[in-house]
Structure formats: C-alpha cells, structure tokens
UniProtKB/Swiss-Prot annotation:
Name listed for the protein in its UniProt record: Beta-ketoacyl-[acyl-carrier-protein] synthase III
TM ranges: none
Uppermost EC category: transferase
EC numbers for this chain: 2.3.1.180, 2.3.1.300
Active site: 121, 257, 288
An annotated GO cellular component: cytoplasm
Protein localization: Cytoplasm
Phylogenetic classification of the source organism: Bacteria, Bacillati, Actinomycetota, Actinomycetes, Kitasatosporales
Key words of the record: Acyltransferase, Cytoplasm, Fatty acid biosynthesis, Fatty acid metabolism, Lipid biosynthesis, Lipid metabolism, Multifunctional enzyme, Transferase
C-alpha cells in the first residue's frame, strides 16, 4: 500500500507585525465619570492610565484589516501570497461567515484558506503556533495571524470591578519560511476549575428569551485569576523557554499578556527577568485587549527600535478558561520607516 507524500519540513519565523489602535483614547479621569472611583486608585491598582475605545465604525473587521495591512507591508508580502489567514477573537457577534474570510477578501488574499479561533487572552499565541506549524509542515508558505477585539462590547461600563481594565484594538503578524528556527514550540494548558473565574454573566440565548437577565457581560474574580497567573503561568513561561533551548537571561524582550501592570510586574519578579530584558507594558495606555494584547504589545516593541531584530523574545497569553499559551520567537527587524 503506498504511503503519503508530504513536503519536507522547514523552519518558520515572524516576518512582519502590525497593529491598529482606535482613535479615541479614554483617560482614567473619564472612566471615573461612569464608575465610582478615582484616577489614583485605578492607576495604583493596575498601572493603567488610559485605554482605547473603538467608535462604531471601528469594527473588529476594520481594525483587523488595518493591522493586517501594516503587518504585510512590514513583511514585504503581497496579500496574494498569503496561503492561510487565522483570526483570533472573542468579540465577533457574527459567527458565520468566518471573520477570517471577510478579512482575507478585503485584503485581496483570495488565494488563502482561513478560519477563526476563540481562546480568549491566549488566542494570539495559539494562532501563532498554528501558523508556525502550517509553514514548517510545508502546507503554507505565508500565514497571516490576526487578533482583533472590541472588549468594550462585552463589558458593563458601570461595573466598578473591571470596566476600567479593558480596551479595544487589533494586532497582526505574518509568518513565513526561515533558514533558522524562528518560532519555538508552543506551551499550552488549561485549568477547568477556573471556568467561573472569568466568564460571561449569561448566554445570548438566555438574553433573547429573557431580557431581564441583562445583556451578557464579562464577570471576573480578579483575585482568583491573579493567584492562578502566579501559580500556573510562571511555570508555563519557564517551560516555553526550556523547550526552545533558552534561559531567561538569553532574552532581549518579554511580551506577556497585558492584563494589567501589576500582574506583569509579578511575572517579571517570579521569572527572574534580568534588567537588560525589555518588558512590554503596553497596557499602560492600551488597557487589556484580550487576545489582541500580545499582538499589540509585540508590534509596539518591534517598531520602537528598543530591541534588535533577530533577538529572542518570550510571549505568553493567559486568561479565561482558565487557559494559557506561549512560545519563544526571534523578533523581526524594525520597519525601515517606523510608523
């Protein structure tokens, strides 16, 4: 019986990154006009000073396309060269057709396949691992990864416990072939005992049947999520380094999920991240954008020129599930004309 013929395996890396940040920047002072709080309390507890909130015309598709165009330009890849589009989002209310198809079509990537995934704050790292596998297996040459979120659509702005944390935005990356390993193995995991720690207040079908339950909105046990992040995410980050053959001292950058700066600082401390490593603190003026947060932070880091192209970085996303995913990667060179 004949066997299957498969392409020769190769290496992959991130060729380019891009992002889109909504026009409207909302300060803590403005947030305090809709919740009973103070600017000082919010910044002290979270490190967040402002966040971006999308206007009605800044849909998840619009933001995703804009981020993708910047990533394609940075990578020097034409949309027609994209073989696969993977979109991560938890805030797409149109479940069919797939958002990936709409984004690919608007970009002119009509030769591509595409699908969406939903893994909350870990979504971008999951999507990047799929892209790397697709390139390394020979199934695709160029893969576009997009993470796009309107978190303000799924929160109650009057909820004093979490409305100040979240923002909107999109990030993207183009993955392609490489002469050397450029994306490390993904480390992923779940803790189903934490299902109730970060969840929706009700389902949409419950809301349709009985509007008195209220529009579905995020509910979070912040203390439980914080304890889990320290207990589970830190070992996962160490494992992601180990399987890539790196130590924390080898890194030039650390790009964690931008939950808030307090959690980031604890992760940095527990991991023993040296002072020479640049740590992304994008949440300070972007807020928590769920799956888009790592992508947004990565784009800002690369375009800042603060780290060398080709240097190793560690990314890890974590949140609802509870779940996490992370990997090491070699950073792309900054764009020749930073924007």
């Amino acid at each position: 019986m004949p066997g299957l013929r498969v392409p020769e395996r190769r290496f992959s890396r991130v060729l380019g990154v891009g992002s889109y940040r909504p026009r409207r920047e909302v300060s803590n002072k403005e947030v305090c006009t809709w919740i009973d709080s103070t600017e000082e309390w919010i910044e002290t507890r979270t490190g967040i000073r402002s966040r971006r909130i999308a206007e009605p015309d800044e849909t998840i598709q619009v933001m995703g396309v804009a981020a993708s165009r910047r990533a394609l330009e940075h990578a020097g890849v034409d949309p027609a060269e994209i073989d696969l589009v993977v979109v991560s989002t938890m805030t797409n209310f149109v479940h069919t057709p797939p958002l990936s198809v709409a984004i690919a079509h608007e970009l002119g990537a009509d030769n591509a396949g595409g699908f969406d995934l939903s893994a909350a704050c870990a979504g971008f790292c999951h999507a990047l691992s799929i892209a790397a596998d697709a390139v390394e297996s020979g199934g695709s040459r160029h893969v576009l990864v997009v993470a796009t979120e309107r978190m303000t659509d799924v929160i109650d702005l009057a909820d004093r416990s979490l409305s100040f944390l979240f923002g909107d935005g999109a990030g993207a990356a183009v993955v392609g072939p490489s002469d050397v390993p450029g994306i490390g193995p993904v480390v992923r995991g779940i803790d189903g005992t934490g299902l109730g720690s970060l969840h929706m207040s009700s389902s949409w079908d419950q809301y349709v049947e009985d509007p008195s339950v209220g529009r579905p909105a995020l509910v979070m046990d912040g203390k439980r999520v914080f304890r889990w992040a320290v207990a589970d995410v830190v070992p996962a980050a160490r494992e992601a380094l180990e399987v890539a053959g790196l130590t924390v001292g080898d890194l030039v950058a650390f790009v964690p999920h931008q939950a808030n700066l307090r959690i980031i600082d604890v992760l940095v401390d527990r991991l023993g991240v040296p002072e020479h490593v640049v740590v992304s603190r994008d949440a300070e003026d972007t807020g928590n954008t769920s799956s888009a947060s790592v992508a947004l932070a990565l784009d800002r880091l690369v375009r800042s020129g603060a780290v060398p192209g080709g240097g190793p970085a560690l990314m890890i996303g974590f949140g609802a599930g509870l779940s996490y995913a992370g990997q090491a990667l070699l950073l792309p060179d900054p764009p020749s004309t930073p924007a």
